[in-house]
């Protein structure tokens, strides 16, 4: 089983990516399973908060690089990218728009599309072993998974330029200092602290959570007068 689901008290669900779903999250095999597991939690009215985490060295390592290299050599990369983004991008939108509070408990590497998954969450808590990486430049592809939209909103445009164009890898402390991660906690505290935040943020009514997430989402897209009308 590549995704483990654990229901906790107070309407909190822990979604743990294991095995290939953590180390090669965005493959044709793993991504549909991940999306289905997260979607079921988002659609469940009894789940008010969700914690997404990984296993071992990986939170979510993004694409299967070998599969991408093979698709490039076979001139099939555009179709592979379409197949994956047709699942990933709607999933990220549902996370952003859902009334469910979603917390990323980043235990290890969040790379490529896995970085997009972490950035789309409402909060990001990390262990000292966490790493954030884009990892697109090395395979000649532009960043995906909404990372070029999400990261600048957290750390600023110029800091994001440095991150992408220098193909940087941020450790937990660097990520927190930049503003990409909210807190760094001891490894053995990661899940409990993430659950604590999910409980705290999800204690309010469904409409408040959904409307507030929506307003925060659109606040940079509209001028102030238009924003006041939402």
At which residue positions do the language-model features occur?
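Conserved CoA-thioester-binding segment of acyl-CoA-metabolizing enzymes
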Residues: 1-55
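C-terminal alpha-helix plus adjacent terminal tail
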Residues: 1-10, 44, 167-173, 188-230
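Terminal peptide-recognition signature
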Residues: 15, 33-34, 52, 64, ...
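Glycine- (often His-adjacent) and acidic-residue-rich active-site loop
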Residues: 22, 54-90, 140, 223
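Short, conserved glycine- and acidic-residue-centered signature motifs
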Residues: 27-30, 84, 111
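Crotonase-fold acyl-CoA enzyme core
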Residues: 93-209
């Amino acid at each position: 089983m590549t995704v483990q689901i654990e229901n906790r008290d107070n309407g909190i669900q822990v979604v743990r990516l294991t095995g290939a779903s953590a180390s090669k999250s965005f493959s044709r095999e793993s991504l549909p399973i991940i999306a289905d597991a997260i979607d079921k939690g988002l659609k469940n009215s009894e789940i008010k908060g969700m914690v997404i985490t990984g296993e071992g060295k990986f939170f979510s390592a993004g694409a299967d690089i070998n599969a991408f290299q093979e698709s490039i050599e076979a001139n099939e990369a555009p179709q592979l990218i379409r197949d994956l983004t047709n699942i990933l991008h709607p999933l990220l939108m549902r996370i952003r728009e859902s009334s469910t509070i979603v917390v990323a408990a980043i235990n290890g590497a969040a790379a490529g599309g896995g970085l997009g998954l972490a950035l789309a969450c409402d909060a990001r808590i990390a262990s000292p072993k966490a790493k954030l990486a884009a990892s697109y430049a090395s395979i000649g592809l532009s960043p995906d998974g909404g990372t070029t939209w999400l990261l600048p909103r957290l750390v600023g445009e110029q800091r994001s330029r440095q991150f992408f164009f220098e193909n940087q890898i941020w450790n937990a402390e660097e990520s927190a200092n930049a503003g990409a991660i909210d807190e760094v906690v001891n490894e053995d505290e990661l899940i409990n602290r993430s659950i604590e935040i999910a409980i705290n943020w999800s204690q309010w009514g469904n409409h408040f959570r959904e409307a507030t997430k929506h307003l925060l989402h659109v606040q940079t897209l509209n001028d102030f007068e238009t924003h006041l009308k939402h």
